[in-house]
Amino acid sequence: MAIQLRVFYLVPLLLASYVQTTPRLEKMKMDCYKDVKGTIYNYEALSLNGKERIPFKQYAGKHVLFVNVATYCGLTIQYPELNALQDDLKQFGLVILGFPCNQFGKQEPGDNTEILPGLKYVRPGKGFLPNFQLFAKGDVNGEKEQEIFTFLKRSCPHPSETVVTSKHTFWEPIKVHDIRWNFEKFLVGPNGVPVMRWFHQAPVSTVKSDILAYLNQFKTI
């Protein structure tokens, strides 16, 4: 099975060396708007195995990190780092949720049943499995974007002022608050309201430091 996966995904692996970059220094993080209307508890998403719709209200009281992920991206190295982040901050109420998406460089080409084997045998490989919830593959931008991402993007300005025009992106219409690439992140507070948003190039170590600083106000660390 591992050999078959390696052959089938040769082209996506070649594309994985491409990570969207910008010619100038970008902000890594932006705080979300203070007048956000609504919460994530109004939404739900389909689990990766397609067997259940998971309502986000089940995460009430938790600090939730939403991440759009891809298996064959140069940033897929963040997967093990996200596992470590989940392990380190779970005791403080952090929950990570991953949303596979194929809109950036076509770097999540498989169907839902192929995503976990791709992670386990190809990239990162070596038996890797995420320790956080993954949801069914879907769009995060454009006409068919998942409703939860419409809400998250509306709630938080993007750290980058550069509008997406890359030939490696696949959606319309393009909007200023759109996610720019794989592994962007949104943190939602225990009341279900978005708190901050990170650029895809922000190191997970930076994300962790920002979350720890945020958690200080709750006196949980």
From Swiss-Prot:
Family, as annotated: Belongs to the glutathione peroxidase family.
Taxonomic classification: Eukaryota, Metazoa, Chordata, Craniata, Vertebrata
GO biological process: cellular response to oxidative stress
Keyword terms, alphabetized: Oxidoreductase, Peroxidase, Secreted, Signal
Presence of the UniProt keyword Methyltransferase in the record: no
EC number: 1.11.1.9
Known role: Protects cells and enzymes from oxidative damage, by catalyzing the reduction of hydrogen peroxide, lipid peroxides and organic hydroperoxide, by glutathione. May constitute a glutathione peroxidase-like protective system against peroxide damage in sperm membrane lipids.
Lineage: superkingdom: Eukaryota
Active-site feature positions: C73
Tissue: Epididymis.
Organism: Rattus norvegicus (Rat)
Protein name in UniProt: Epididymal secretory glutathione peroxidase
Recorded GO MF terms: glutathione peroxidase activity
Reaction catalysed by this enzyme: 2 glutathione + H2O2 = glutathione disulfide + 2 H2O
